Amino acid sequence: MAQGNNYGQTSNGVADESPNMLVYRKMEDVIARMQDEKNGIPIRTVKSFLSKIPSVFSGSDIVQWLIKNLTIEDPVEALHLGTLMAAHGYFFPISDHVLTLKDDGTFYRFQTPYFWPSNCWEPENTDYAVYLCKRTMQNKARLELADYEAESLARLQRAFARKWEFIFMQAEAQAKVDKKRDKIERKILDSQERAFWDVHRPVPGCVNTTEVDIKKSSRMRNPHKTRKSVYGLQNDIRSHSPTHTPTPETKPPTEDELQQQIKYWQIQLDRHRLKMSKVADSLLSYTEQYVEYDPFLAPPDPSNPWLSDDTTFWELEASKEPSQQRVKRWGFGMDEALKDPVGREQFLKFLESEFSSENLRFWLAVEDLKKRPIREVPSRVQEIWQEFLAPGAPSAINLDSKSYDKTTQNVKEPGRYTFEDAQEHIYKLMKSDSYPRFIRSSAYQELLQAKKKGKSLTSKRLTSLVQSY
C-alpha cells in the first residue's frame, strides 16, 4: 500500500553505495515474486471476532512458498531464510514486536516499499519521539506502548525537554492526519510504521540488522549515509541516532602524520608475538611440571600431618632439611630458588664457596631495602652504595656503564627503587651464569641425591615394619 503524503522523503543518492545493498536487492527480488498476483503468496482478509484483519498471510504460507519457488529442500533452511527477511523488515508479524518467522498460523503482513531498508534509512531520535508520542494519543489496545517503548519515551522526554513542545505538536498533527484515513488503511499503516521502528529500534535482546559491517564500511569510497527524517522534521531539532553516528569529513593526512603512522606500524611489527599453539604448549608443560606440587591433584610428600598420622612433615621442619620435592623445585628456575628461604641459603653458600657471592648479596640487600620503613631508606641506600658500588667498595659488583650512571643519579634522591636498574642487571647476570653453575654443582646434586636416598631408606624401613607385623 502506498504511503501517505505526511512522510516527506528526499532521494537517496547514496543507496547503491551501501555495503548491504547487494543483500537488500536480492531480498527485494524475492519479495517482488512473493507479491506477484498469480504466483505469489495469497493475501487475504481474515475475519476475527467482531473485526477483520486485512492483507495478511500465515507463516506457513511463506515457508511453503520458499520451498516451492526457491528449490529449497530443507524446511529449516526455508524458515531461516524467511527469518532473515523478516529481521530486515520486509514482512512482519502483525501482533509481535520480535521480527521472526514461525512456521505456523501466525499472521504476517508485507512492508510498504517506502520503509524498505534499501532506502538507506537512518531515522532520528526526534522521529522516534514523535512516533511514540503519537502512539500515546491513540486510545487503541493494539497501539499501547510496550515496556521498553515506555522507557524509551521517558528517556527521550528527558533528553529533549527543551524541544518537547515542538515534538508533541508534530505528534498531534500526525495523529489528526491518521484519523482522517479509512479505518482499514489506518490499521495497515499503523502496523507498517510499528514494524519500521521494530527494525531500527529493536526489542532489547534482538539483533539490529541496520548496523553496517565495519569491514565492509571501510572498503566503501563514501561510507556516509544520508540522514533523513521520517516525518520531515527540520535539521535544527534533530539528534544523532544511538546506533549510527555521522562520521566527520576527514582531511588528507599530512606528511608528519604519515611518518607517525609508519613509525607506529613499525613498532607493532617489532613486537614479540606468540602463536596460540605455542602458548598452549607452554601452558601444558607448566601444568605437567607443577602438577605434583598441587595437593588437589597429587598427594603431597610428605603428607599433611593434620590429615594423616605421618609426622614426617614436622620432623623435616624441625630439622630444617628440605624435602626432595622442595630441592627438585629449585631446578625449575632461579625464581624458585630465590623465593625459598632454604634455597636462597644454599645458593648463597655455593656462591661463597666460589668467592662470588657479592651479586646475590647485593640482590638480597635491594629486596630488603624495598621492605624497609621510609625513614630508614636514605641511610640504607648509602650503606648499599658504599658496600657494593662506591669506588673501592669491599664487595664491588660488575655493572654496565648505563646501569651504573643511572644508579649514580638515583642515589642523589634515595628511594626504595634507587637500585632498580642495577638489580635487574645483576639478576640477568646470575640467571645466565651463577644459577646454572649452582644447579650443575656437586653441592646441589648431593643435596638432591641425599633426599632420594633418605626417601628410599624410609620406604624400606616402612616395608620391613609391615612385613614384621
From Swiss-Prot:
Residue ranges annotated for the RGS domain, each copy included: 333-448
PROSITE patterns: DEP, RGS
Cellular location(s): Cytoplasm, Cytosol; Cytoplasm; Cell membrane; Membrane
Record-annotated G protein gamma domain positions: 255-316
Domain of life of the organism encoding this protein: Eukaryota
Coiled coil residues, start to end: none
PTMs per UniProt: Palmitoylated. Ubiquitinated, leading to rapid proteasomal degradation.
GO biological process annotation, one example: G protein-coupled receptor signaling pathway
GO CC list: cytoplasm; cytosol; neuron projection; plasma membrane
Keyword Isomerase attached: no
Record-linked InterPro entries: DEP_dom, G-protein_gamma-like_dom, GGL_sf, RGS, RGS6/7/9/11, RGS6/7/9/11_DHEX_sf, RGS_DHEX, RGS_sf
Residue ranges annotated for the DEP domain, each copy included: 37-112
Region (Disordered): 235-256
Major subcellular site: cytoplasm
Function: GTPase activator component of the RGS7-GNB5 complex that regulates G protein-coupled receptor signaling cascades. The RGS7-GNB5 complex acts as an inhibitor signal transduction by promoting the GTPase activity of G protein alpha subunits, such as GNAO1, thereby driving them into their inactive GDP-bound form. May play a role in synaptic vesicle exocytosis. Glycine-dependent regulation of the RGS7-GNB5 complex by GPR158 affects mood and cognition via its ability to regulate neuronal excitability in L2/L3 pyramidal neurons of the prefrontal cortex.
Oligomer status and interactors: Interacts with GNB5, forming the RGS7-GNB5 complex. Interacts with GPR158; promotes the GTPase activator activity of the RGS7-GNB5 complex in absence of glycine, in contrast GTPase activator activity of the RGS7-GNB5 complex is inhibited in presence of glycine. Interacts with GPR179. Interacts with PKD1; this prevents rapid proteasomal degradation. Interacts with RGS7BP, leading to regulate the subcellular location of the heterodimer formed with GNB5. Interacts (phosphorylated form) with 14-3-3 protein YWHAQ. Interacts with SNAPIN. Interacts with GNAI1. Interacts with GNAO1, GNAI3 and GNAZ.
Protein name listed in UniProt: Regulator of G-protein signaling 7
Organism of origin: Bos taurus
Gene encoding the protein: RGS7
